[in-house]
Structures are given as C-alpha cells and as structure tokens.
A protein has these predicted regions:
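Gly/Ser/Thr/Pro-enriched helix-cap/hinge segments flanking short amphipathic alpha-helices
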Residues: 23-36, 42-45, 53, 63, ...
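Blade-edge beta-strand/turn elements of extracellular beta-propeller
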Residues: 46-49, 117-126, 167-177, 244-256, ...
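Repeat-based blade/solenoid architectures
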Residues: 55-76, 103, 125-137, 176-187, ...
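Beta-propeller blade termini
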Residues: 74-84, 111, 132-146, 161, ...
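Hydrophobic beta-strand segments that make up the repeating blades of beta-propeller
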Residues: 87-94, 144-153, 199-203, 277-282, ...
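Short, conserved, GDST-rich strand-edge loop motifs in beta-rich repeat architectures
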Residues: 93-104, 203-230, 391-409
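Beta-propeller blade signature
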Residues: 107-112, 233-240, 291, 348-349, ...
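Asp-box/WD-like beta-propeller blade repeats and closely related beta-sheet repeat scaffolds
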Residues: 122-141, 146, 151-191, 201-228, ...
C-alpha cells in the first residue's frame, strides 16, 4: 500500500543499494514498449456463471464512512469438499458491521449440487458464526479423512473441526490456538514431517478501532491509512501435538518477527532438501523467505536470496503470493502481487538460494505496473502443461482516480498465458473476465468435475464471482489426490512428478497461496495432446517413494501412501 512512499523509496535507494543485488538480472533492462496481447489458447473462455449457479453472496466490509483500515482489505474464499461427496464446495468468508444494525453477516458455504448449481447451507453447518473474517485455510489436521477449516478474524481466529456430513464444530478453545492479532492468510503444512499438519498464520498490523488513525489523500477528506502508519506484528506457527492440541512455537521456530506486516504466505521447498519452506509477503516491510532447517526452526534467507526488496532496494506493498515451477527448471519460482506502480514480482529461482525478478523485463511486469494486486496464483488454465498466471486486482480507495488519473478503483483481472521458455503473454478469455472489479481473494479448482480449472473471486464489499472454464479440457489432463498413511492424511508436502511425451512436470501438494484464500489441494497436470502418462512418481514426506506407469489421461487418480492407486477414473470426461 502506498501514500507518501516516494520519500521512503528514495531513502531506500540511497541507503540500501546492495540489498537488492540478488534480485537484479545482469544485463537486463525493462522493455520500452508493452507487448501486444496474444490470443488465448484456442477456444478457451471463462464464463461468468454466478447468477446461474445460485451463488448470491455479497461481502460486508462494515464500511460506514469512518474509513477503518480493515474495510479496505476484503476477505477470501476456499474451494474444498466440505461433505466428502467428491465435489468441490465454496466457502466465502465475510466481514460484519462495526456497530449493530439489526442484521447478521455470515460466511456462506455453497454445497455443490453436481449440476452446475450451488445451495447455501451455512445455516446449521457450525460455520454460521458472525465475525470479521479475513482468510481461510483448509486441511485434515487430525487425519480422520475430513477437511477441517481455519478462519482468520479480527474477532479472534477460529478452528472448525469437520464432523462429517457437512457439519462443523468450533474447537478453537480446546485446540490451544490463540491468535488475537490481525490475521490474514494462513497455510497448513507439516513443517517437522511428523505426520501431523501444523498451521502458519500471517498477521498484519497492530490495529484497533480505538487506535485508528486519520489519514488523507488530499489533506481534507479522510482516506484509508497505509500500513506505514501502524506498527507491525509477528506471525504465528502452531505445532500440531496430536489429539486436537496445538502449541505456539512462533518464537522458538524463528518466524515471529514483530516488525512484519504480512498478507500472504506460500509453502514451497525452494532448495529441494525435502523440508517445506515458507515465503511470506509483507506490506511495506521486507518479505520473508523462511528456510526450514530441519530441526524445528527456520532462518530468514530473503535478503540473501534477493526476494526481500524490489530491485531498487525498497520494500513493496506485497499482498498475494504463489510458487510454482513455471519453466520446467526443476525449481519453484515465486509470484507476488504488489501495490499500484510496483508491478507483479516474478522471482525466478536460479538455484543456490538465489532468485532474480524477471518481471521488470517481461510482459508480466509491464502490464501489471498500474494495477493493485491481491489474489495471485499459477494454474494451467488451458491444460497445455505450462503453469499460467492469474492476478486479481482492485484498488483500496474509491476516490483514487481523483488524485491519480491513471489509476482506477475497479480493475480487471489479468491472465498471462505461459508461452514456454519463461515467456508470458496476456490472454483474452471472454469479455466477462475482462470486467473491472474490486477483487481480493481468488481461488481455482474443478467445480464441475470436467477436468479444467474454474475460478472464484471475492470482491471487497461486493459480490463473489464464479467463472467456469469452458474449453480448457480440449487438452488432456491428470489430477492426483494423495492419501497419506505414514505421512499426513492430505499428503501435504508430497512431491508429485508426471512424465508424458511432452516432457516432465512436478509440483508440491500444499495449501495457502493467493490472498486469504485456498484453491483445490489435489494438483492438476495439463498434458496437452498427450493421452497417456508414462510415469507418475510420488515422494512422500515420510520418505516413501512410489512409481506408476502408463496411466490413461483425463482421470482423477487417488494414490494411497501404503496401498498405491486405490481409485482411478472418477471424474473421467471426454475432452470437449
């Protein structure tokens, strides 16, 4: 976020020129002209099906003219199978009024009816709790085969245990989780590889209604303050002790820096040592790259790696984040959504613990310069085997155009198609997808079980939007669901590798990423024209390794860590 940040930027350039050396690509300079949009993959369209689907959700930011900081941020969305019927449901997080107005603002849990429609079943689900919710993370923390839900909230975070049948129970008090801070994004991961998933919670700033500050864009009218105005606060790491109990190990583990102002978190293994690391996006503070040392502690390597600052040596307004191997180099790279006039960051993992920001010299940076990006992720929307980029955009101030004519409050999302060899081009996938909105959370998953990946956006103080992917499944695909036995039940931290005639791909099974949201856990591999997966290999956190050969495309494969493939063919469809 940004107000009078020019002084800070100038000061950073003078005092910190050496800090960003790891982030500068030698010999590279920003291109002089933006690249022309390239056509999308043939026949792929994102169709707005919100009205037809029955999703009728409007986010309540609580805004009433007082310009409280949280009102500008918005909440997230999770796509997961809440009731175990094999279809993704939609959980939309909500805020609330600051003062009672005789209405109740609840989250929404949309049950998938298996026919392209959804029904809100929040009432009586146990998730029907009024709170000023922000983010959501989903995983099976007790290894009982059902997905549990963690919600960050200004009223105190909540942990909901999945009781089965789409019913949940608030177990926060009994769990030992006590995050009373300004929680935003969260991620489940088994950082100590003991077979039980732990919880990382990103916290933002020290804010309360009675300590809200007065800020202005023009010196006359109150506007939303930027995070520079508030002190930071430490994020939290809760170790799963088993039996539904958690222990706060934030300080002991080395991830509780009190100066942080965190909005996004991504789980990755950037050095390939088999231990899950964390990248934390900070707003006007240096980003964090926590290297898992394999002994219960982490070390921040962001400065040395070149991901703490921009290449000018300043901390950007970082919000959403994701990680993926977009160029088949065998290493995960980082994507970060930033503030207006800061562009997306696309940190390429060079190996040896060093990253280079490729965005300034690429279409990704040029096109995203003026947008303000919250939700971001890599996903293969056209199933050609190359991860593409989506950015959900929208400004904080409704009046921003009055003081910055080139900047708009509502902004269209950006979709960058991966052309191979590390190159991206903007993609046109229908007029509805290009509609400006005040987007915040963003998640992807196969809502209709047809193979390709659909998208859900949340908007701040506005409606949720559901986009169906039409035509992505003209290419072939394989989805892999992992069921841990020695490892955690969800298989989080498992490396999945796929080889077909078109080459090799891999990913890490994980949660988190984007902004305050969670996408489908089971990874989907695009295969392009390939109809057969030659090899499917899994490396589990326990050390178990599995290898399967000659699997037909266009199916969901369920792999049990002990038994091997226990289900295949569920969701098989013919490419359209």
């Amino acid at each position: 976020m940004k107000s009078a940040r020019k002084f800070l930027l100038a000061l950073s350039v003078v005092l910190l020129p050496v800090l960003a050396l790891g982030a500068v690509a030698p010999g590279k300079a920003p291109a002089k002209a933006a690249a022309k949009p390239a056509p999308a993959a043939k026949g792929v369209t994102f169709t707005d099906i919100t009205a037809a689907s029955g999703v009728k959700f409007t986010h309540n930011s609580g805004r009433s003219g007082k310009k409280y900081l949280p009102e500008s941020l918005g909440s997230g969305v999770a796509l997961f199978d809440a009731d175990g019927d094999g279809w993704l449901d939609i959980l939309l997080i909500n805020g609330r009024d600051w003062d009672p107005k005789g209405r109740t603002s609840l989250p929404a849990l949309y049950h998938n009816n298996h026919d392209g429609t959804f029904t809100n079943v929040i009432r009586g689900s146990g998730l029907d709790v009024q709170m000023y919710g922000m983010g959501v993370a989903v995983a099976d923390y007790d290894n009982d085969g059902r997905e549990d839900v963690y919600v960050t909230s200004l009223d105190g975070d909540r942990l909901f245990h999945n009781e089965g049948g789409g019913k949940f129970k608030d177990v926060t008090a009994a769990s030992g989780i006590r995050n009373a801070s300004f929680g935003t994004s969260a991620a489940w991961l088994d950082y100590d590889r003991d077979g039980k998933v732990d919880l990382f919670v990103a916290n933002y700033v020290q804010w309360s209604r009675d300590k809200d500050l007065w800020c202005s864009l023009d010196g006359a009218i109150k506007s939303y303050c930027t995070p520079e105005s508030y002190k930071g606060t430490g994020s939290k790491l809760y170790r799963n002790l088993g039996g539904g109990k958690f222990e706060d190990v934030s300080q002991k583990a080395g991830v509780g820096d009190p100066t942080s102002k965190s909005l996004g978190v991504a789980v990755l293994d950037y050095n390939g040592d088999g231990w899950p690391d964390l990248f934390v996006a900070n707003d006007t503070q240096p980003n964090k790259l926590y290297r898992n040392q394999g002994n219960g502690t982490f070390k921040d390597e962001a400065l040395e790696a070149g991901v703490a600052f921009s290449e000018e040596g300043t901390a950007r307004g970082a919000m959403g984040v994701d990680a993926a191997d977009y160029d088949r180099s065998g290493r995960p790279h980082l994507l970060v959504g930033n503030f207006t006039n800061e562009m997306l960051a696309l940190y390429h993992n060079e190996g040896g613990g060093v990253f280079v920001d490729e965005a300034p010299s690429s279409t990704v940076g040029q096109v995203s310069l003026l947008t303000l990006t919250f939700g971001v992720f890599f996903f293969d929307y056209d199933l050609d085997g190359l991860p593409d980029i989506l950015a959900a955009n929208g400004h904080l101030e409704e009046e921003i155009n009055r003081v910055q004519p080139r900047i708009q409050y509502k902004e269209p999302p950006l979709l960058f198609r991966n052309l191979g060899n590390g190159k991206f081009a903007t993609a046109a996938v229908g007029s509805a997808f290009a509609r400006p909105m005040v987007a915040r959370g963003a998640a992807y998953g196969d809502l209709d079980n047809d193979g390709d990946l659909d998208v859900v956006f949340t908007t701040n103080h506005g409606p949720a939007v559901v986009f169906r992917n039409d035509g992505g499944n003209r290419n072939h695909w394989l989805r892999v669901k992992t069921v841990g036995t020695r490892s955690n039940r969800d298989g989080l931290g498992t490396v999945v590798r796929v080889t077909s005639a078109g080459g090799k791909q891999w990913t890490l099974v994980r949660t988190g990423s984007s902004y305050c949201s969670q996408s489908e856990i089971a990874p989907t591999f695009g295969l392009g024209p390939d109809k057969v997966v030659q090899t499917l290999e899994l490396e589990w956190p326990s050390g178990t390794r599995q290898r399967f050969t000659n699997l037909p495309a266009n199916q969901v494969v369920t792999v049990d860590e002990t038994k091997g493939i226990v289900g295949a063919g569920v969701g098989v469809v013919k490419a359209k």
